[in-house]
Amino acid sequence: MRPMRIFLNDDRHVMAKHSVVYPTQEELEAVQNMVSHTERALKAVSDWIDQQEKDCSGEQEQPMAEETETTEEGKDSEMKTGENPTRTLRGVMRVGLVAKGLLLKGDLDLELVLLCRDKPTISLLKRVADNLVLQFETVSEDKYEVIQNIREALIVVKSTKEPPLTLNIRLTSPLVREEMEKLSAGETLTVSDPPDVLDRHKCLAALASLRHAKWFQARANGLKSCVIVIRVLRDLCTRVPTWEPLRGWPLELLCEKAIGTANRPMGAGEALRRVLECLSSGILMPDGSGLYDPCEKDASDALEHLERQQREDITQSAQHALRLAAFGQLHKVLGMDPLPSKMPKKTKVETPVIDYTVQIPPSTTYAMPPLKRPIEEDGDDKSPSKKKKKIQKKDEKSEPPQVMNALMRLNQLKPGLQYKLISQTGPVHAPVFTMSVEVDDKTFEASGPSKKTAKLHVAVKVLQDMGLPTGMEEKEEGTDESEQKPVVQTPAQPDDSAEVDSAALDQAESAKQQGPILTKHGKNPVMELNEKRRGLKYELISETGGSHDKRFVMEVEVDGVKFQGSGSNKKVAKAYAALSALEKLFPDYTMYTEAPKKKRPPMMPRGGPKFAGKHNQGFGMMYSEVPPPQAMRGRGRGGMNRGRGRGRGGFGGGYMNSGGYGGGYGGNYNYQTSATAGYSQFYSNGGASGNAGGGGAGTGGYSSYYQGDSYSAPTPPKPFVNKKPPPPQQQQQQQPPPQHASNPPKPSYNQGYQGHQGGQQQQQQQQQQQTYNQNQYSNYGPPQKQKGGYNQGAQGAGSGGSYNYSNSYTGGTAPLGTAVERVQEGEAAALTQRQALVTTQAHTPAMVEPAVLRRTKVTRSLITIKVPPDRTTVALQIITSSLREELGVTAGIQNTT
């Protein structure tokens, strides 16, 4: 698995630093020569001591009978730990940096452990050291200096030439550990130690180093990047004094635990950052978890030698190093200069590949018993899984390489490219991704239904720009039919196996490049074929290829004809077989079209029809000369044309079971409480469009849909003139009625704006129909020439749409013919610069806006009201004393200011 791209820069810096601190080939050769010479000399010393002991004991055995002659490399005289239990010197083993392969440039101290049969003594150490000088002269021409260090229980061997290497040979025995375990268990020792025995703690430390070397070879050497990170951190411990206490076994154990617990192999940069994260977490702190030593029977902390201040200093330094690495300054942690972002192209030079894991080959003089039995190549008990793997490897070598797409080709040519997501458009079910990549200071962009497909298209563009093959040529040269059609095999033509194989290879290659296999209708071929022929069975005909590039051939029989398809898996092969059957048996199959969905009527735009191209003059809120619309759904629970209300009335479900928010086509705001909600008559006003009420007046005025008193916005009358209005006969002569005036008017409780031509005649109709207008206040409008009565809405065309707020009194209608006649004979005047309306009725208070009562004269037959234009709104309810008996109500004045 390749490292993550976000750590590529860190990997480059870590590997560059590692190449600097790694020892040169000359240094490694010098270490190898000194170690091998010492091992061969110790083997000769062991033979000499064993021969002397046999001569002294009188035994007549030939100690060398089972051994072959020693060659120059010392490969034939191997002494293993378990094979020579009677020898005084049982074997020599590499430990420390030599065994673990952690040598750095400038490391001059090497270690070996010499195992003894009995507890090592001072006399044994001197005998070995004295004879070792003689054996060096016979083994090698190089001169070595041998020094005895009894206090440390070791023999020091120094080289006399450059580099001045030092090799420490530690003497120990497994009996020292066994006696320690017995003492800890409370047992008494029956055998007394010799008086000149070496220091027990030094011997135990040598045994521990031997266990550490075995554990490291088994756990850390095979872990990717672990040895490299340890070498880099060993250099850090040398350069930074804060890290010095961590050097050695604790550092090795910590790196193995941090890197080995990852869920995937990591590069050198990512592995180093993971170790820094582990240290930064506070694992070294006194209250931390500590570090368990796996090479000890009893639970022990490998960090117990660290002091509290040292733990805090190392943790703080690791946190600082982690911050630097996070901000792209890992070179400061490594103590090196930053590398350029783009490395210059270098000519390829054949250099030997260096194995950074193994620095020095294993010893051949004293061979350690292997941790596991070697695989017997010719044995009958060879694992069958091993055989299977070898067979698969042979098959993989013999098969052609896997077909590469454009993205794979580009990654081979330009590794480490960064693909960026530019945009994501389209709906959720069909998104379109746009990816870009920068190659050689050029930016390429492409789109696709997924990020992966978009990246593939970008790679195709890059390869085309470079003039390199993209892997799509075969698909472009051939037609779609020749690519996707598998060979059809009928029972009468069974000799098409070669053609099937060639088509199978083409299908497999095109499948990898084209993505999912779909029919011309965008469906899965197997699903579409199953819709036409149920119960089809797909059979596997053949399976070829290696484990990494399988080829499957599937066959299906449809209507007595067999169709085959091939692919890299059974699913793809089935799809191509079904696709072949569809194209052969159903070539003219039309695409399935869904049933047309029920279209909703167009919603009325906000703001009403004032945005329409054609409407009545003035501030109207209704369309002119427009037919009634279809039923429109709103947000309420009403009828077909739902409004905001909850009524279940007819079209234009209203606020209180009738009326609606924009109930009419013109969009009047009707808030009515009438229980007689019904279908509004659009053409009840003699064909005039607008919100005409059911059975409305004979003129084309704007009024409410429903029966009841309407709320109109008439234009204000002219200033006060003490002149009586002309009789109805004269008005009829002066202004002829409209075309629809001849129709007999229907009785209605509804009255809105009157037409400009039928104003006077409608005044008479109002007197006959006993129309009740309530709560009328006007909107802005031009002044009219004709005066309107108190019981009429302001006459004239040109005023805008009306806001109808009706309450629809349906009970207790008193005969007001006398009252209406008396009111119409009165005189009224209003001085105002804004719209004003004065109305007197039996049940509705008159609204005056803006006006205040100046003087009220109550007479038996006349009511006079004068209002100034600069006062606030007042509401009057005037009932003359002469009408009290007729109306049965009381008179009063109500001021709402």
UniProtKB/Swiss-Prot annotation:
Residues 5-379 form the DZF domain. GO terms for molecular function: double-stranded RNA binding; mRNA 3'-UTR AU-rich region binding; mRNA 5'-UTR binding; sequence-specific DNA binding; single-stranded RNA binding; transcription cis-regulatory region binding. Changing F552A: Abolishes mRNA-binding and cytoplasmic retention, localizing predominantly to the nucleus from early development. Also disrupts DNA-binding. Residues 399-468, 521-587 form the DRBM domain. Its main location: nucleus. SMART domains: DSRM (SM00358), DZF (SM00572). Changing F433A: Abolishes mRNA-binding and cytoplasmic retention, localizing predominantly to the nucleus from early development. Also disrupts DNA-binding. One of its GO terms (biological process) is spliceosome-depend formation of circular RNA. Residues 72-81, 373-384 have a biased composition (Basic and acidic residues). Residues 637-650 have a biased composition (Gly residues). Residues 52-85, 364-403, 466-502, 627-650, 708-797 are annotated as: Disordered. Gene3D superfamilies: 1.10.1410.40, 3.30.160.20, Beta Polymerase, domain 2. GO terms for cellular component: cytoplasm; nucleus; precatalytic spliceosome; ribonucleoprotein complex. Keywords: Antiviral defense, Cytoplasm, Developmental protein, DNA-binding, Methylation, Nucleus, Phosphoprotein, Repeat, RNA-binding, Transcription, Transcription regulation. Residues 749-794 have a biased composition (Low complexity). Residues 714-747 have a biased composition (Pro residues). A component of a ybx2/frgy2-containing mRNA-ribonucleoprotein (mRNP) complex. Also a component of the CCAAT box transcription factor (CBTF) complex. RNA-binding protein that plays an essential role in the biogenesis of circular RNAs (circRNAs) which are produced by back-splicing circularization of pre-mRNAs. Within the nucleus, promotes circRNAs processing by stabilizing the regulatory elements residing in the flanking introns of the circularized exons. Plays thereby a role in the back-splicing of a subset of circRNAs. As a consequence, participates in a wide range of transcriptional and post-transcriptional processes. Binds to poly-U elements and AU-rich elements (AREs) in the 3'-UTR of target mRNAs. This is Interleukin enhancer-binding factor 3-A. It comes from Xenopus laevis (African clawed frog). The lineage of its organism: Eukaryota, Metazoa, Chordata, Craniata, Vertebrata. The gene is ilf3-a.
